[in-house]
Amino acid sequence: IAVSGVVCKGVVMDSAAFPSLNHIDVAKRLNEKFGLTVLIDNDLHVATNVARKYSNYQDGITVLYAYGKRKSGSGIIANGEVLCGASGAAGEVENIPLHTPDIESERIAFCSERLQAIIALMNPGRVVIYELDEGMDTDKLIGLIKSKMKPYLLPEFKLGRDFFEDCFLGLSIVCEVGIKQSLRERLDF
């Protein structure tokens, strides 16, 4: 299961999209109720696994940034590994303390500031950008970043394919890893 929000060791810690799941071990509850192995992770961490596995992003730092009219977030690949952070909150750009705009017209500028903060902190070689909603102006987003940051900080910008498709593909990768880990534990490898 891919969830928008912070997920740590199978527990949804904080999800604005699904607040009723906060602090619940969803995987454990579903396992107990249906007898199925359930894996749960952050949606961007899941999608980032696709880029990690099927691209040449094994060296250096790559940031995947997804943004829309009401949400934004990022996934981070560092030297071939997806960074989740100590509490699963790596990439949760909503935690960066910036002014939140009241009107939708400021959304691009707001997302630009958040992405600039990530670029300044992580200094990635590339940023892959997903548009979560129709009508988002990625050219404007990139233009704002280029106008405000020093040229040596600017990464290569790429447009992501389809965020939701990458989430589904990423779930298969997470399941594959989970099954292998479960087998190793059961067989004492």
Feature map (PLM): residue ranges:
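Glycine/GP-enriched mid-protein hinge/lid loop-to-helix segment characteristic of carbohydrate kinases
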Residues: 31-124, 135
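ATP-binding/phosphotransfer module of carbohydrate and carboxylate kinases, centering on a glycine-rich
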Residues: 33-36, 56, 98-189
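Glycine-rich phosphate-binding loop and adjoining helix at the ATP-binding site
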Residues: 2-52, 59-60, 141-148
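A general structural-boundary detector
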Residues: 13, 17, 67, 114, ...
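Structural motif
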Residues: 2-5, 67-68, 130-133
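Short amphipathic alpha-helical leader/targeting segments
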Residues: 24, 94-95, 185
